Amino acid sequence: ALFPIFYYNKEAFLAQSPQLYKEQLTMSFEKVFEIAPIFRAEPSRTNRHLAEAISIDLEEAFVDYNDVMSRIEEIIKVSIIAVNDYIKNNPDSEFTSTPVPENIPRYTYDDLVDRMQKAGAKTEWGDDLYPSNLKKIGLDGFYFITDWPLGPKPFYVKDSKSNPKISESFDLMFGDLELSSGSTRIEKRDELAQRMCNK
């Protein structure tokens, strides 16, 4: 998606992500990734809503969201090992050593809503999982939230085979901070066209 700004008295456009183009490229290349700056016109002014960041985008054919979560888990482990090795070889560095997670837990959206309600949070099925409510159930470190409601998800996100109200999607969290998100993409043209019309 693009949004306009004025730059030297001319209209220019800043990109968010060429995700839909990358999805098309997977038909030829199977795996497509990009590391690039992204710009977002977020209306919120918090430390959780960055206007600019460096993004790692991955699109891959013939996989589902479980495969993508496993790939992210591998990337996190390799990254932490590399940083810890750097710290060991550079004791004056300002980095802090971090333990490598054995496995990154996966919690379903339904499970977390249930836990939040039991902890006294005012949340209903279909609501976003706000940081204040996540804090009430005491999750920390890395974890995935999976199987979000389909309703608010983009048109290209695949629904669950077992429940059409659920999406094959995830968010990667660290404590109450969202680091990444992803999903299984709809691969059938007719289904994708129908979803676009319904959205």
Question: Which residues does each predicted region cover?
Answer:
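Short loop/turn segments at secondary-structure transitions that flank enzyme active sites
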Residues: 9, 20, 41, 64, ...
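A residue-level signal for conserved active-site and pocket-lining positions in enzyme catalytic cores
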Residues: 14, 58, 112, 145, ...
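Conserved phosphate/anionic-ligand binding catalytic regions in large, soluble enzymes, centered on
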Residues: 26, 178-186
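A generic structural motif
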Residues: 57-68, 176-178
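Active-site pocket scaffolds in enzymes
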Residues: 183-184, 188-199
